[in-house]
Amino acid sequence: APTEADATWVDLYNRVMIHQPASSYYAAEMHNEAKTDNPEEVLDLDRDVFMSAAYGIVDTVWYVQAELVNGRGGAVVAGL
């Protein structure tokens, strides 16, 4: 079931902040999950990216393009 964090994610999906050292990890994971065409795995990764921002581990702002994944907000990290 959606949580309060999920609602905040939907509100803030256009500008997600993540920790700089994690950027290459997320880029690689997004690329791999996209190749598997598994939207559930991509959605989980999106939540991980958001939670990094929610806990204040922020060095860099990445712009995120929203798209629907299984009827819920998902995202593709751009510019990596």
UniProtKB/Swiss-Prot annotation:
The protein's enzyme class: hydrolase
Record GO cellular component, one term: chloroplast
Residues of the active site: 19
Protein origin, superkingdom: Eukaryota
Catalyzed reactions: Hydrolysis of proteins to small peptides in the presence of ATP and magnesium. alpha-casein is the usual test substrate. In the absence of ATP, only oligopeptides shorter than five residues are hydrolyzed (such as succinyl-Leu-Tyr-|-NHMec, and Leu-Tyr-Leu-|-Tyr-Trp, in which cleavage of the -Tyr-|-Leu- and -Tyr-|-Trp bonds also occurs)
Keyword Metal-binding appears in the UniProt entry: no
E.C. number(s) listed in UniProt: 3.4.21.92
Keywords, ordered alphabetically: Chloroplast, Hydrolase, Plastid, Protease, Serine protease
Coiled coil: none
Further comment: On the 2D-gel the determined pI of this protein is: 5.7, its MW is: 22.8 kDa.
Assembly: Component of the chloroplastic Clp protease core complex.
Protein name (record): Putative ATP-dependent Clp protease proteolytic subunit
Organism of derivation: Pinus strobus (Eastern white pine)
Taxonomic placement: Eukaryota, Viridiplantae, Streptophyta, Embryophyta, Tracheophyta
